[in-house]
Curated annotation (Swiss-Prot):
Gene behind this protein: plsY
Upper classification of the organism: Bacteria, Pseudomonadati, Pseudomonadota, Gammaproteobacteria, Alteromonadales
InterPro entries per the UniProt record, alphabetical: G3P_acylTferase_PlsY
UniProt keyword terms in alphabetical order: Cell inner membrane, Cell membrane, Lipid biosynthesis, Lipid metabolism, Membrane, Phospholipid biosynthesis, Phospholipid metabolism, Transferase, Transmembrane, Transmembrane helix
Organism: Shewanella woodyi (strain ATCC 51908 / MS32)
Protein name as it appears in the record: Glycerol-3-phosphate acyltransferase
Domain of life of the organism encoding this protein: Bacteria
Family: Belongs to the PlsY family.
Length: 202
């Protein structure tokens, strides 16, 4: 790995892009409660689903994934090495987790991390999405689904395109570290299960 002005610029740009909190902005635009103070307190798509419904959560998920996908794809097209790609992707996730524009209080970084992995190929994107959805259907724990999918991601990548195993493993490690408290709650049986906002009957 060679640190160049281009690499440093991409790292900074990725962090700043990641710092744009899609959850907070979507909730403000739609007149919803602040996701940092409602539900689980996590400004991410899953919590927005709880407090705002499917369409709001879908918007948050799309933009959170885009924050990871764009920097990773641009860095790849610029010919940066795999370690640099991993660091740039992590910078986008760290922006989401510690956003400079929102008092450094952000989310878990799952969607942004998976978004950064997605440009590797549609097969990987489908495997990641399928693994997460399957785990949610089986256990109803969004956090456990994210952890299991993160653990599987390097193996999927090794099978599909082993050039990117290292950056994917770096992102997977970050996801698992960010879920330390969730793991503790899962072990104690105290973790909240996946749910969405119920539409009032008329």
């Amino acid at each position: 790995m060679t640190i160049t002005a281009l690499t440093l610029g991409m790292i900074l740009s990725a962090y700043l892009a990641g710092s744009i909190s899609s959850a907070v902005l979507v909730c403000r635009l739609r007149g919803l409660p602040d996701p940092r103070t409602q539900g689980s307190g996590n400004p991410g798509a899953t919590n927005v689903l709880r407090i705002g419904g499917v369409s709001s959560a879908a918007l948050v998920l799309f933009f959170d994934m885009l924050k990871g996908a764009l920097p990773a794809y641009i860095a790849f097209r610029l010919g940066l090495d795999s370690v640099s790609l991993g660091i740039i992707a992590i910078a986008a996730c760290l922006g989401h987790i510690f956003p400079i524009f929102f008092h450094f209080k952000g989310g878990k970084g799952v969607a942004t991390a998976f978004g950064a992995m997605a440009p590797i190929g549609p097969e990987l994107a489908l495997l990641l999405m399928g693994s997460w959805v399957l785990m949610v259907l089986i256990c109803r724990y969004s956090s456990l689904a994210a952890i299991v999918t993160a653990l599987l991601a390097p193996f999927y990548t090794w099978y599909l395109d082993d050039r990117f195993v290292l950056p994917v493993a770096m992102l997977s490690a970050l996801i698992i570290i960010r879920h330390k408290e969730n793991i503790q709650r899962l072990l104690k049986g105290e973790e909240s299960k996946f749910s969405r906002k119920k539409t009032p009957k008329t």
